[in-house]
């Protein structure tokens, strides 16, 4: 699964743009990324793209 560190996430949306499965959305209210782990294929694109290293993907 992929997890978002809310303290590190700036809500920039880079991960949303990079996710090939559209498994990430931005929670406008909280200002952070949210991963739908049912859709996530653990490819690591979001983790690689995140400028704040706020997402970790674990197999």
Curated annotation (Swiss-Prot):
Q: Which residues bind [4Fe-4S] cluster 1?
A: 9, 12, 15, 50
User: Sorted alphabetically, which keywords does the UniProt record give?
Assistant: 4Fe-4S, Electron transport, Iron, Iron-sulfur, Metal-binding, Repeat, Transport
Q: Which InterPro entries match?
A: 4Fe4S_Fe-S-bd (IPR017896), 4Fe4S_Fe_S_CS (IPR017900), PSI_iron-sulfur_center (IPR050157)
Cofactor binding notes:
Binds 2 [4Fe-4S] clusters.
A molecular function GO annotation: oxidoreductase activity
- Residue span, 4Fe-4S ferredoxin-type domain: 2-29, 31-59
Which cofactors are named for this entry? [4Fe-4S] cluster
What the entry lists under PROSITE patterns is as follows: 4FE4S_FER_1 (PS00198), 4FE4S_FER_2 (PS51379)
**Stated name of the protein:** Ferredoxin
What lineage is this protein's organism placed in? Archaea, Methanobacteriati, Methanobacteriota, Stenosarchaea group, Methanomicrobia
